[in-house]
Amino acid sequence: MSKFLHLLRQLDSSQIITLGFLTVILFGAVILSLPICSADFTFTPFVDSLFTATSAVCITGLTAVSTAYHWNILGKLIILMLIQIGGIGFMSIVTMLFIAVGKKITLKERIVIQESFNLSQRHGLVSFTIYIFKFSFVVELIGAFFLSLRFIPQYGFVRGIFYGIFHSVSAFCNAGFDLLGKTDHLYPSLTSYVGNPLVNLTIMGLIVIGGIGFLTWDDIYTKKYHFRQYCMQSKVILLTSLFLIFVPAAFFFFRDFAGMPVKERTLCALFQSVTTRTAGFNTADLSGMTGASQAIMIVLMMIGGAPGSTAGGMKITTFA
């Protein structure tokens, strides 16, 4: 045991972050493979549970089995926890646990936190981590409230609230997991809500808020609406995000979804533009889109979101 602890102390910050995520993924995969997590209370093949856990922690949204029908409530809660850990970061969770038990954050731990969020300085790291938790909780709570307004009438009170929470967290963390499977189509995502403004705007808002990044929102909160005072990174992220949302959306509007009414067509074009950059939801059959639109979506997927955000990709700042 002492040798193992000594080995851990020798790891650098990037190795600690990598090992932490691998540990979370493997732990989640083992739990998901157990009968207590499946709807029919049978063992899930480990490769399927490992794929699901990896996809959740890495906020990818790809699934090997139906999230709606294969997993029971415990399995869905495990997936939700993995998404949250992947979205706000492994080191954020560890830091908050240290704060909760009164443990002092060491210099090495501060360096790990700094690297996990791509921060340029170590000053105020603990307060920044607390800010991330508070910000995430408030945004996800608001998103869950609005989504529940639609889900409760459709699924009942308890299930509607759970669906609201699950999809709010999944959208904010840019994960793309959903619980809306149908018996005739196991992976419909949000296609049944293509014309629903409440669901579309809420999901899009959560994706954008999560994808812009915690540093950008901290800059906005500190300097309010004085755009000229924002740091260069925040300006680049905000302006480029607007470009990457509305220009592809306009292209999708005129090239795809021709049979839809104007309202649905507008929502659908905007939604596909927003969600493509790592979120993974969809409100339309993407296989029916034109080749040019699919090529644009591939580029958007590659770009992703902002540094220090819940989104993946090569990052907006790299693209800009």
Regions picked out by a protein language model, each given a short descriptive name:
Residues 1-320:
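Membrane-proximal intracellular helices of multi-pass ion channels
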